[in-house]
C-alpha cells in the first residue's frame, strides 16, 4: 500500500538530486498523483488508446514504467490476441515493486518487467509504445536516438504516447502555467518547504522541453503525425502515429 509523500517535509541542509530510490518507491503513487495534474486521466486514457490502437501478435512497451500504472492500464484496455507487454525501468527498487503490482492482477496478457536503461532496449514489432513522464529525465542528447529507435520498431499505424512536463517560450505563459502548477501542489497539501526542496532536487535532473521542441524531435525521428491530445497546466501528452 502506498504511503503519504513527506520526503521533503523536513528542512534539509543539503538537497541531493532527485532519484527513484527506495524512499521514493514507497510513496510514488501518492507523490505523482499530488504532483502531476491530470495524471490519472492520462493513465486511464492509455488504456483507451491501447484498446483502439493495439494489433494482434504485437509488442507493447512501457518505457520508464515506474510501478506499472501505464502497463496495467494497457493490459486492461488490450483486446487483441497474441500480444505481450514489455515494461522497462532502470531503478531496481521500482522494478521489484512493479512486478508485485503486475502479479497482483490476473490477466491472460503476459508482462515482462526488465531492469535496464531504456536506451538499451531494441523496439520491435510494436503497436503501442508509452513514454509517460520519462523522456524528461533522459539527457537531451540521448532523446532523438531513443525516439528513432521507437519509430523504427513501430508497425505502420503504431502509436507513441509521450507525456511530459512542458516549458513555454512566452515568459508570461510560462510563469502563469508554472504558478498554476504550484497552486495545484498546494491544493494537494504540499507545504512551501516541500515544494521548494522538491524543486531544488529536480534541478538539472528533470529537463523539460517546449511542445515545439518535442514536435521537431519527433519529426526528425520519422514521426509525421503528432498531436497534443491532452494538457493540464504545464503537463501534457502527445500522441504520434507512424
Swiss-Prot record:
<dbReference type="InterPro" id="IPR029063">
    <property type="entry name" value="SAM-dependent_MTases_sf"/>
</dbReference>
<dbReference type="Pfam" id="PF13649">
    <property type="entry name" value="Methyltransf_25"/>
</dbReference>
<dbReference type="GO" id="GO:0002098">
    <property type="term" value="P:tRNA wobble uridine modification"/>
</dbReference>
<dbReference type="GO" id="GO:1904047">
    <property type="term" value="F:S-adenosyl-L-methionine binding"/>
</dbReference>
<dbReference type="GO" id="GO:0016743">
    <property type="term" value="F:carboxyl- or carbamoyltransferase activity"/>
</dbReference>
<dbReference type="InterPro" id="IPR041698">
    <property type="entry name" value="Methyltransf_25"/>
</dbReference>
<comment type="function">
    <text>Catalyzes the conversion of S-adenosyl-L-methionine (SAM) to carboxy-S-adenosyl-L-methionine (Cx-SAM).</text>
</comment>
<feature type="binding site">
    <location>
        <begin position="117"/>
        <end position="118"/>
    </location>
    <ligand>
        <name>S-adenosyl-L-methionine</name>
    </ligand>
</feature>
<keyword id="KW-0949">S-adenosyl-L-methionine</keyword>
<comment type="similarity">
    <text>Belongs to the class I-like SAM-binding methyltransferase superfamily. Cx-SAM synthase family.</text>
</comment>
<feature type="binding site">
    <location>
        <position position="132"/>
    </location>
    <ligand>
        <name>S-adenosyl-L-methionine</name>
    </ligand>
</feature>
<feature type="binding site">
    <location>
        <position position="39"/>
    </location>
    <ligand>
        <name>S-adenosyl-L-methionine</name>
    </ligand>
</feature>
<feature type="binding site">
    <location>
        <begin position="64"/>
        <end position="66"/>
    </location>
    <ligand>
        <name>S-adenosyl-L-methionine</name>
    </ligand>
</feature>
<feature type="binding site">
    <location>
        <position position="199"/>
    </location>
    <ligand>
        <name>S-adenosyl-L-methionine</name>
    </ligand>
</feature>
<dbReference type="InterPro" id="IPR005271">
    <property type="entry name" value="CmoA"/>
</dbReference>
<comment type="subunit">
    <text>Homodimer.</text>
</comment>
<feature type="binding site">
    <location>
        <begin position="89"/>
        <end position="90"/>
    </location>
    <ligand>
        <name>S-adenosyl-L-methionine</name>
    </ligand>
</feature>
<keyword id="KW-0808">Transferase</keyword>
<protein>
    <recommendedName>
        <fullName>Carboxy-S-adenosyl-L-methionine synthase</fullName>
        <ecNumber>2.1.3.-</ecNumber>
    </recommendedName>
</protein>
